[in-house]
Each structure stands twice: as structure tokens, then as C-alpha cells.
């Protein structure tokens, strides 16, 4: 069995003295692991960093085996990204979200989305908006999508500013006014006709509160999980008031202890 594909490095762990098990999110083969001979050495260190894009060749005697990867770096963005304070948290959180997908189950649209996110990840506000949208997309991919296209109470498609915490449906300003304190806020950048250009820190907090509630209830808690420290760190980093000074750059831990 063998195939070639493009992939994004999600994680790496040492295997034996000199090899490493590498986890990729691939375009056509989903989230897939493989053994890289020499992967624990310094030669491949620049390539085997979370967030990098690679071209992968995989082979195994049987399809169900772990198999072996031959990897070639395509877009080695990790070093540049990790000079940005929020990026280490963001890449770690992206990888954790990708691991919610079943192993070896193709999700080409999610792969393309992660590629686009990583290419536009240096700006904190845009990175925050991208991650909220990715969490929303992940809910949909896992079968728990939110209907933000029309008011759940009246069917109108305009002035949607709330979301029901029970149904996950959008609610218009007029219909939601009597229960505004019990509804989640739908930030402008999640509405179909809006972009993230004017997104504020409060908008990002509202977005993460929205997606976080449904991820926790529908996906994480049934698996015995909760929100990660990386997610919390990322939200703090991208919503931090500029007047408070810069956060220190957080490095990704070296999975092979080098």
C-alpha cells in the first residue's frame, strides 16, 4: 500500500533512538500517522514542526499498519509564526481541533481551511476570527452545525444578533430582546454579509463563547474532555488590550525533548 499527498504537521513524538511518529492532516487521506526514520535527528527538525506544510509519501505492507512516511518540506512557516506571541497557542489549539476528526477519514475542506488560516495567522485579530470560524466549521463537520442563516423564532434573515444556547439557531434582535440576557451574542464577523476587518476584542470573546459552548456540550464533554489551556491562552493573547504591552513569545514544547 502506498500513496502521496500534501499534509500539515499536527504533532511529532520520538519513537526509539532516531525515529519519530508524525501526525499529519492530509488533503485526501485525513488525519494520518506514520513513522519517519531519522525523524528525531537535527536534519529533519526544521521540517517536523507543527504548522509546516509538507509533501508526504506513505507506504505500508497493509493499509491498517502505521506505515512509513517520506516527507519533503513545502511551506516551512513554523519558525516565522512562532515569533508571534499568539501563534504557539493557536497552532496547538488548531492541532487539538483537528484531532477531533476521525483518523484516516478524508476532510479535504478542513485541510484547505487550515492551510488558509496558517497563511494569514500573523495578525492577532484575523487569527482570532479564523479560529472562531474554524471551531464553527468543526461543529458542522462533526454533525453539530449551528443554523445562523435565519431567526429560529420568526424565520427572518436580517438583524440576527443572538444565538439560542439550546437549539444553536440564530435569533433576531426583535425576537430575542425579551430574553437577551439568556441568549448568546452572534458577533458581526460570523454573519454572512460581514467580514473580520472591523472585528473587536469583544467580538472575538463573544465568538469563542458561542462556539466554545457547543463544542464543550456536544463534542468535548461526551469524550470526557474540556477546553484546553492552549485555547484559553490563545483567546487571552488575541483579545489582550494593546496598551498592556506585548505578551512574551511562547515556544512550542519540543516533542522529542531536544
UniProtKB/Swiss-Prot annotation:
Q: Does the keyword Endoplasmic reticulum apply?
A: no
Similarity annotation: Belongs to the RecO family.
Disulfide cysteine pairs (residue numbers): none
* Coiled-coil portions: none
UniProt-recorded name of the protein: DNA repair protein RecO
Q: Which organism is it from?
A: Rhodopseudomonas palustris (strain BisA53)
- Which Pfam families is this protein grouped with? RecO_C, RecO_N
Gene Ontology cellular-component terms for this entry are: bacterial nucleoid
Its function, per the record, reads: Involved in DNA repair and RecF pathway recombination.
Q: DNA damage: is it a keyword of this entry?
A: yes
HAMAP family named in the record:
RecO (MF_00201)
> Which keywords are on file for this protein?
DNA damage, DNA recombination, DNA repair
Transmembrane parts of this sequence:
none
- Highest taxon listed in the record's lineage: Bacteria
Q: Which GO terms describe its biological process?
A: DNA recombination; double-strand break repair
Amino acid at each position: 500500500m502506498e500513496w502521496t499527498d500534501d499534509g500539515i504537521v499536527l504533532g511529532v513524538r520520538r519513537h526509539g533512538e532516531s525515529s519519530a511518529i508524525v501526525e499529519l492532516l492530509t488533503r485526501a487521506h485525513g488525519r494520518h500517522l506514520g513513522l519517519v526514520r531519522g525523524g528525531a535527528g537535527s536534519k529533519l527538525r526544521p521540517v517536523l514542526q507543527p504548522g509546516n506544510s509538507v509533501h508526504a509519501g506513505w507506504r505500508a505492507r497493509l493499509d491498517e499498519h502505521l506505515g512509513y512516511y517520506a516527507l519533503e518540506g513545502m511551506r516551512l512557516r513554523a519558525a516565522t509564526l512562532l515569533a508571534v506571541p499568539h501563534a504557539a497557542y493557536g497552532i496547538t489549539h488548531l492541532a487539538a481541533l483537528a484531532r477531533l476528526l476521525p483518523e484516516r477519514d478524508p476532510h479535504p475542506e478542513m485541510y484547505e481551511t487550515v492551510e488558509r488560516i496558517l497563511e494569514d495567522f500573523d495578525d492577532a485579530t484575523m487569527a482570532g476570527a479564523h479560529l472562531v470560524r474554524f471551531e464553527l466549521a468543526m461543529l458542522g463537520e462533526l454533525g453539530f452545525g449551528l443554523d445562523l442563516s435565519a431567526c429560529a423564532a420568526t424565520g427572518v434573515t436580517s438583524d440576527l444578533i443572538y444565538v439560542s444556547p439550546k437549539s444553536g439557531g440564530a435569533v433576531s434582535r426583535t425576537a430575542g430582546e425579551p430574553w437577551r440576557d439568556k441568549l448568546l451574542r452572534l458577533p458581526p464577523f460570523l454573519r454572512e454579509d460581514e467580514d473580520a476587518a472591523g472585528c473587536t476584542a469583544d467580538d472575538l470573546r463573544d465568538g469563542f463563547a458561542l462556539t466554545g459552548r457547543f463544542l464543550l456540550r456536544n463534542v468535548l464533554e461526551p469524550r470526557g474532555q474540556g477546553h484546553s489551556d492552549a485555547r484559553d491562552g490563545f483567546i487571552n493573547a488575541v483579545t489582550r488590550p494593546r496598551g498592556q504591552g506585548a505578551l512574551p513569545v511562547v515556544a512550542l514544547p519540543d516533542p522529542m525533548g531536544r
